[in-house]
Amino acid sequence: MSNYDFKKIEQFSQSLWDFSSCDFQRKKYYVLSMFPYPSGKLHIGHLRNYVIGDVLARYKRSQGYNVLHPIGWDAFGLPAEKAAINSNIHPRIWTEKNIAKMRTSLKSIGLSYDWSRELSTCSPKYYEHEQKFFLAFLKAGLAYRKNSEVNWDPIDKTVLANEQVIDGRGWRSGAVVVKRKIPQWFLKISDFSEELLKGLESLTGWPEKVKTMQTNWIGKSEGAVIKFSISGYEERFIEVFTTRPETIFGASFCAISVNHPLVNELNLLSNAEREILRIQTTCESDHYDDNKNFSGTTNLEKVHEQKLGILTKIKVKHPFSGDELPLYVANFVFAEYGSGAIFGCPAHDTRDFAFAQQYNLPCLRVISAKCTNTALPYCLEEGVMCNSNFLDGMQVIEARKFIIEKISSIGIGEAKNSYRLRDWGISRQRYWGCPIPVVYCEKCSMQPVKVEDLPVTLPEEVEFTVQGNPLEHHPTWKYTNCPKCGGPAVRDTDTFDTFFESSWYFAAFCSKEGGIVKESCKRFLPVDMYIGGIEHAILHLLYARFFTRALNKCGYIDIVEPFRNLLTQGMVCHETYQNSSGEYLYPEEAKSLLEKGEKVLVGKIEKMSKSKKNVVDLEEIVSKYGADAARFFILSDNPPENSFGWSDRGINASFKFLQRIKNLVERYLSSKNSGEVQTGQNVKIQINKIICDMTKYMDEIKLNCAVAKIHELVNLLSASGALSKETIHVLLRILEPFAPHLAEYLASKLENNVILYGSPWVAYNEVLTQSDAVTLMVRKNGKFVQLLEVKKDSSEEEIISQAKRLIKNAVVDKVIYVPGKMVNFLCSSPG
C-alpha cells in the first residue's frame, strides 16, 4: 500500500471539484438518494445507496446534463428524544452534532452533492413551509381531526408508537399499554385511492414488485353494499359490503366490527365483551403506523388463527327471503374497510366457513361447480348458481351483475368499490417534530394560526424527565391568543408524523431559496432517478405520491407523480460472528479473539444489523483502504438491486486493482518521452467495444457489469502494451464515476489544467462495433502472449488451431477457451 497514498490523492482531487454549478440551458437530470436520518454514524449499507446515486450523477454530467444531486437530513424523530432522556442532551444539539459528523463522512467519500442546497427538516426555515401546506390542506378539506385509537402508557401518560411497545408494555415505564381514543389529525389520502392505484400504470420505471406492494396496500375491492334491516327496529339498516353479492342466498349470519357505530347505539356489548374483542382484534390504527413490515400485506388481509365473535341480542333480516340471521360482533371485521359489516356465506368463503364451524352455523351451497369439487368451502368464481331463487342457473359472473342491478332497482343497495387504504394519521405526541399550526379557543373552537405568524417553532427549554408529552407540560409555550378573537387560546401540542417532512423534501431541493418555488419545480421535477431501500416501498413512497397530488390540488406544483424512475438497492450483508457463549461479536472483536487463539463461530452472511453486530464502520474502511476502494468494491459483484456480501478479501482486491491502475498510468507517464505508442487496429476495436458496452451498462444501471468492463480494459492495456494518451484517457474517463479521486488525480498528471469531473463521456464508433471480427487474448499458462483477431463465426476448433500457432512448439496439456474473450494454453513444456 506504500505507493498508493490515497489520502493525499483524495485531498488533491476534492480541492478541484465544484458541485454547485448549474447550466439551465442543458437538459435536466435529477438523481436523488433517499436522505438519511442523522444517527451520527454511516455504515457500509449507507455507502451503497449514496454511491449508486453519485455514479449516476457523475455519468449524467459527463453526458451533458444539468444534474441536480442534492443532500439533506431527515432530522426529526424519536431517537433524538430518547437521547435527550438517556444522555441528558437536547434533541437539537444531539441532531446537529450528528449532522456535522455525517456531513464530514459523506464529503470524505467524494459524493458530488450540491451542498449549497443542503437542508435539515428540523430547521424552522424548512418546516415553516409544511405548516403552510397543512393550512392549505385544511382549507381544501384534505385535513381533519377525529378521535382515534392509540397505544396509551398509563404511567408516562403518553401515546406510544408501535415500536415503543415491547411485549405489550411501554418501552420506558414498563407499564401495560392500553388502547385509548384521543383526538388526532388525519390527511385524506383515501380520497386519492383510485388515483394512486391508476397512477401506478404510468410508472414504467418502477420495479414491478414495488407497484404490486402498493397495489396490495391500497387494496381495491369491487363489490356492492346491501342493506339488511334490523328486526324490531323500524327504518334501521346495516349496510353490508361484499365482493361476492351473488352469494347472498347462502348468507347464514352477519357480523360487524367492534368499532361499528351500532355497538354503542344499541348497547350490543358489555364492557368485558368489548375488551375481549379489542384484545383479539389487531389494532386498526396499526394499519398505518411507522414500523410495518413491507410485504404489502395489510392487517385487514391477515387471517386470525381464531375467529372470535360475540352473538348480539338482535337479528337482521335477509333482504330477499326475509329470514332472520344472527348478528355477531367479530374480530375479523374492520370498521374502516368497506362498511364495517359483512354477511357470512360459509359455503363459499374460507374465513366465513371457519367462523361457521366454530359457532355451528348453517352452511348452504349456492354455487354448483362444473368440476367434481364438492368440498366446502368452494371459493372459485366459476360454476352455476343454485339454491338462489331468481339467480338459479346463471353463471357466477352473470349472477353478480344481475344481483347488483336488482338491489339498485329496488333501493336496497348499489355497486361500490372499497379500498383498504385508510386516511393518514399525522399526529404524534412527541416534542421533536414539527408543531401543528392550530390553536383551540373556548369561544372560537379550533382556529388555524395565521400564515404571517408562521413558523410556530418549538420551545428550547423543555423538560424530558416529566411524564407525558413535553409540549403538553410546558409552562408557557402552549398558551397563546386566538387568531380570530384575540382571547386566550391553547396550542395543539402534537407534532407531525416525520413522514410529513419526507413527503415533499424532493421538491424543496429544486430551489436554494427553500420551500417550494413553482418555477424551480417545473425545471427539475419529477425526480428522474430515486434510490432507496425496498423497505420504503409502501409508506414513504405512497405518502410522497399522495402529498404530491395534494400539493398539486392546492396549486403548489404541476406534477402528480414525484419519481419517474425508482431503484431499490439491495441490502449489504456480512458474516456473523459469535463467541463460545453464543454472544454476537463485532468483526473487530472476532478478529481479536482469533488472534488470541480463542474460538469464534462464523455464521451465515446476513443483512447488517446492530443486533447481530455484523456492521462495518465506513470511517474505518475509508481510513484503511480509501474512499475509492470502498466505492469500487460496493458496486463490483452484484447488480444494484441485489444483496451484496461485504468481505475483507473483496475490499482488499479492489484496493489492489486501483493500485494496479495507478501503476499502469504512471508507467505510461514515465515512458511517454520515448514517444507515443501507436495503438493497433485490433486493440482499437477492442477498446471501442468496451466503451460501447460500458455506455450501455451505465444507461441500464448495470453497474457491476460496468465495473467488469473497467477490469477488461485494464487487462487489455496491460497485456497489449497499448498505452497512449488516448487509451489512458479512455480508462480514466470510465473509471471516474466509480473511483473519482484516483481518476481525477491521474488525469491531472496526464494533462495539466484539465479537470475530469464533468468532462464529456468517451465516444465510440458504431461502425467498429459492427465488425465481423472479434479479438481474443492468447495466453500461455495465464501469461499474455498476443492478441488474435478471428471471424465471429469461426468454430472453437478453428480458433484454437490459429491460437496454437502463436505458442510455437510448446506441449499443450489443457486448453481453456472463453468464447469471445480468451484462449489459455496450459503447457508443461515451454516449447
Curated annotation (Swiss-Prot):
Motif 'KMSKS' region: where in chain: 607-611
Subcellular location as annotated: Cytoplasm
Transmembrane residue ranges: none
Catalytic activity: tRNA(Leu) + L-leucine + ATP = L-leucyl-tRNA(Leu) + AMP + diphosphate
Keyword Cytoplasm set for record: yes
InterPro entries xref list: aa-tRNA-synth_I_CS, aa-tRNA-synth_Ia, Leu-tRNA-ligase, Leu_tRNA-synth_edit, M/V/L/I-tRNA-synth_anticd-bd, Methionyl/Leucyl_tRNA_Synth, Rossmann-like_a/b/a_fold, tRNAsynth_Ia_anticodon-bd
Main localization (coarse): cytoplasm
Keyword Lipid metabolism: no
Motif ('HIGH' region): 36-46
GO cellular component, one term: cytoplasm
Residues the record lists as binding ATP: 610
Keywords, in A-Z order: Aminoacyl-tRNA synthetase, ATP-binding, Cytoplasm, Ligase, Nucleotide-binding, Protein biosynthesis
EC number: 6.1.1.4
Top-level lineage group: Bacteria
SUPFAM superfamilies tied to this protein: Anticodon-binding domain of a subclass of class I aminoacyl-tRNA synthetases, Nucleotidylyl transferase, ValRS/IleRS/LeuRS editing domain
GO biological process: leucyl-tRNA aminoacylation
Molecular function terms from GO: aminoacyl-tRNA deacylase activity; ATP binding; leucine-tRNA ligase activity
Family statement drawn from the similarity comment of this UniProt entry: Belongs to the class-I aminoacyl-tRNA synthetase family.
HAMAP family tied to this protein: Leu_tRNA_synth_B
Protein name: Leucine--tRNA ligase
Gene: leuS
